[in-house]
């Protein structure tokens, strides 16, 4: 059973650690509008729930559907947004030229690179599928003031490759392996957080 959002918020509050943050990903598909919520009302409802829980400063909202992120940036600038991208056969929300239904009117052809698209959209955090990242993109994004996160990085070789690229964060189902790789490199490790359901 998936917990309701209110249950998740209650768990976070019970943990009692103000450093505990939430990353909430919207699952809206502009290619299947009859199967998912409309982005603007959904984003507004999500913002209201986060604010009502008093967790706006501890929550980031992620989405492949940038329309959602544009609404959140307008309605709740205090809530960080994270621009998700994939440029794969199984999902390409960025496209190769004109704007796609995913990118809220921002087009690769108009900006020349994904980091520039995200910057133009008002984004500050880019979370890319790890297999799409290279050193030049990471460097460009960071020079534009973007934080770069890589997802979902579970294999030791992939983790090492992302650390070599200098990404700002790694999304992983195996945080133990990420921490081990960071420790081997002498990188500072964040303290763990204990949460009892």
How should these model regions be labeled?
Residues 1-80, 84-88, 99-102, 107-110, ...:
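Metal-dependent phosphodiesterase/phospholipase catalytic core, i.e.
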Residues 83-84, 91-197:
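C-terminal active-site rim and adjoining tail of enzyme catalytic domains
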């Amino acid at each position: 059973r998936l917990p309701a959002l209110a249950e998740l918020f209650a768990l976070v509050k019970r943990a009692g650690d103000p450093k505990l943050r939430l990353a909430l990903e919207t699952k809206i598909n502009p290619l299947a509008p009859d199967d998912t919520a409309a982005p603007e009302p959904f984003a507004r409802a999500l913002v209201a729930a986060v604010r009502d829980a008093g967790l706006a400063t501890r929550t980031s909202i992620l989405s492949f559907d940038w329309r959602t992120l544009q609404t959140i940036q307008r309605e709740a600038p205090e809530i960080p947004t994270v621009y998700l991208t994939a440029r794969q056969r199984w999902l390409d929300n960025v496209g190769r030229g004109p704007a796609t239904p995913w990118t809220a009117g921002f087009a690769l052809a108009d900006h020349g690179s994904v980091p520039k698209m995200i910057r133009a959209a008002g984004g500050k955090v880019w979370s890319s599928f790890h297999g799409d990242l290279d050193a030049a993109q990471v460097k460009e994004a960071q020079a534009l003031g973007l934080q770069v996160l890589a997802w979902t990085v579970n294999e030791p070789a992939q983790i090492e490759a992302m650390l070599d690229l200098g990404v700002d964060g790694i999304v992983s189902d195996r945080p133990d392996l990420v921490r081990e790789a960071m420790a081997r490199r002498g990188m500072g490790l964040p303290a763990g957080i204990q949460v009892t359901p």
